[in-house]
A protein has these predicted regions:
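Short glycine/serine/threonine-enriched helix-capping/active-site loop
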Residues: 1, 34-37, 130-131, 138
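Active-site acidic short loop of glycosyltransferases
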Residues: 1-2, 28, 102
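Short beta-strand-to-loop acidic/aromatic patch adjacent to the donor-nucleotide binding site
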Residues: 1-14
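Conserved acidic residues
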Residues: 2, 32, 83
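Generic structural signal for small/hydrophobic residues in well-ordered secondary structure
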Residues: 8-10, 34, 93, 107, ...
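Conserved donor NDP-sugar-binding/catalytic core segment of glycosyltransferases
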Residues: 11-55
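A short, conserved alpha-helix in the catalytic core of glycosyltransferases
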Residues: 18-22, 76-101, 105-136
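C-terminal, non-catalytic tails of nucleotide-sugar-dependent glycosyltransferases
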Residues: 42, 54-81, 91, 127, ...
């Protein structure tokens, strides 16, 4: 096939022409990965693109916003370039996937999708979020939470490896977002510092 669709088994389709919506962007030469709007079962946003450098690494933008909310500057109602998207539902041309050597298996669970998207960006492509393809994501239903000591250790190891691999890019920040945002929040709050 020409396109690959990475799709978690804990998702449920909401919009009927979601695959066509994703292909519309994935077929464009400049586009690497395409991600969708993922909702929690309570109809709040789980994923609408990933902000890079947030919460020290990466975070889902608009997380927990209500489904009908337009988002910061309307970003929940139009397709746009984003730094990364989640592999819970990600489409990419097979040629791009092969060009960057696919997912890095050393990131067993955490950051494998963000690492992949950064490598796609480094290869000269852009990643796109579309709000017109929507799915429910029953997050962590299939793999569970990272609460056991072994899972916690694996997660911490993946965090460290990600920080080492992408230190330069993390320091540069996310060109798709305003550099004045508070990077410790996912809600587009500005980091306002008092004048001295």
């Amino acid at each position: 096939g020409e396109y690959l669709l990475l799709l978690n088994n804990d998702t449920e389709v909401i919009t009927p022409r979601w695959i066509e919506e994703m292909v519309m962007y994935a077929q464009q030469e400049r586009v690497g990965c395409v991600g969708v709007k993922l909702l929690y079962p309570d109809n709040t946003i789980q994923h609408a693109g990933i902000g890079f450098g947030y919460l020290t690494l990466a975070a889902h933008m608009h997380k927990n916003f209500p489904v009908g909310h337009p988002g910061y500057m309307g970003r929940l109602v139009y397709a746009q370039d984003v730094y990364a998207v989640t592999a819970a539902c990600l489409m990419v041309r097979k040629s791009v996937y092969d060009e960057v050597n696919g997912l890095d298996e050393s990131f067993a669970v955490a950051f494998n999708d963000v690492d992949f998207c950064v490598r796609v960006r480094e290869a000269g492509y852009t990643n796109v979020f579309t709000p017109f393809a929507q799915l429910y994501h029953y997050e962590s239903k299939s793999r569970g939470l990272d609460e056991s000591p072994a899972k916690r250790k694996r997660f911490e190891s993946e965090v460290k490896r990600f920080q080492q691999r992408w230190a330069k890019q993390l320091a540069a920040g996310d060109p798709c977002l305003n550099p004045n945002f508070d990077l410790m929040k996912e809600d587009f709050t500005f980091d306002i510092k008092p004048l001295e």
